Amino acid sequence: MLHPVTATHRQTKNPGKSPRKKLDRRQAEELAFSDAKGPFDIIGDVHGCLDELLELMAALGYRVERRAGKFVVTPPEGRRLAFAGDLVNRGPATPDVLRLVMNMVRSGQAYCVPGNQDVKLARALRSRNARGKVGGLLLSLEQFGDEPAEFRAESARFLDGLASHYVLDDGNLVVAHAGLKERLHGSGSAKARKFALSGQNTGKIDKFGLPVRYNWAADYRGSALVVYGHTPVAEPLWINNTVNIDTGCVYGGHLTALRYPERETVSVPAKAVYSASRKRFLPARVTSA
């Protein structure tokens, strides 16, 4: 029997604390800045992997029931979820993942930031035209094929309305899909949104034909813990005061959550390889003779 994997990371360095930035009205509309101190359970890239999401939530102590087509969630006392984006595409159950997350966000049980895949799906749902769509996006549109038009529109509105990143716990915690440089924390600018969604490319292409991303975490010296995903890694990756929790569930890896402020990660294994990764990040599988 497979069991959730847990690990704890202790902060070894305490950078000088940066002052909380004052936001203007426009920025406040774009950015969710909350004094909520948690505790939080932050979940990495789901990519439509509903079964693994439900298993991970159970491991974290959340009880989920489905009643009349709706998800009803009972969280552990005092805890809230936060989703680090890329809820959708590539996996087997994108519509139901959205049903679950939308319900939790609207009931005040969860926070959610968008990922680049969420933005792509919202745009495609609005267009109602699958022509030219390929791969994981096409799969999601096919899954939405039997859904009512009202739910398609509701899903697009939800994804469109997500703030680019969250600043939580009085500035001590930042959740952004692709991470975020310190100087962009608390910014509602287009530049901050673009970075939070997709990061920053160096302009180079690697041997797999993929753009090489700027390693912003290596230069990060901020006091806020930044929790992000976007680039799959074999196990949670701690660099300075940041952690990447996209452990590639949709590619056959794990779905991971970070418990905050405990700094403990909890992971459940993927039940299948739902999509092929162009770039290997998981160890080679060992097969018996």
What label would you give each PLM region?
Residues H9-R10, N14-D24, D35, K194, ...:
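Acidic, His/Gly-rich catalytic cores of divalent-metal-dependent hydrolytic chemistry
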Residues G48-D51, N89-P92, V119-A122, E182-R183, ...:
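Active-site environment of divalent metal-dependent phosphoester hydrolases
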Residues Q27-A36, V73-P75, V101-V105, Y166-D170, ...:
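A short acidic-Thr-Gly-centered motif at the start of a beta-strand
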Residues A178-G179, L184-A190, W238-N240:
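A short secondary-structure junction signal
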Residues F40-H47, L173-G179, V243-I245:
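Active-site-proximal beta-strand elements of phosphoester/diester hydrolases
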Residues L2-L98:
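N-terminal active-site segment of His-dependent metallophosphoesterases
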Residues P76-G78, R90-N172, E182, R193-F208:
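Active-site neighborhood of divalent metal-dependent phosphoester bond hydrolases
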Residues D45, D86, G115-N116, S140, ...:
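Divalent metal-coordination and catalytic microenvironments
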